[in-house]
Amino acid sequence: YHQLDAVRKVVAAGRAEGPGQNYLIQHSAGSGKTNSISWLSHRLASLHDAGDRKVFDCVVVITDRRVLDQQLQDAIYQIEHAQGVVKAIDQDSKQLAAALIDGTKIVITTLQKFPFVLRGLLHAAGAETQEKATAEERAQAKAWESEIAKRRYAVIVDEAHSSQTGETARELKAILGAGAVEDAEGETDWED
């Protein structure tokens, strides 16, 4: 029950305040963090404000493990099986770039893939390598980068205490746009 209560509070705040806010849900070991993350990701992916406008274009679930947490993936997939709703990024930055381009509602990835997204955009545009990219391929990648930065993201970070510092976190913020993820100051804390 405490997981559902925390999810409801974050969803209500997200509906009222919109993107660009920070919330912290603290869980003790074995208290249902996976449930909270999976329920929250689906609720935020379909969240609309009081004017019936979609609040977030995409929910990005980030784990700091280099190999995606299978339990977390399974929990998120169990809720929604429709094609294109959930995409686990278990290969490379090209796969992450494609998910951000095609409008996937929920993207599950590791933090380590974000520094390479721009290279993935070039590859998705048809370039074999960054050095061999044509002007047209670079222009397409730049257009996608601009489009990605304009979208509104909800970013759910598993183990946020170890994931939100350093160069990789700054690159995540740069790719998803300035308003997508703010520094973890002044955040609301709902403790479990």
Each language-model region and where it sits:
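RecA-like P-loop NTPase motor core of helicase/translocase proteins
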Residues: 1-192
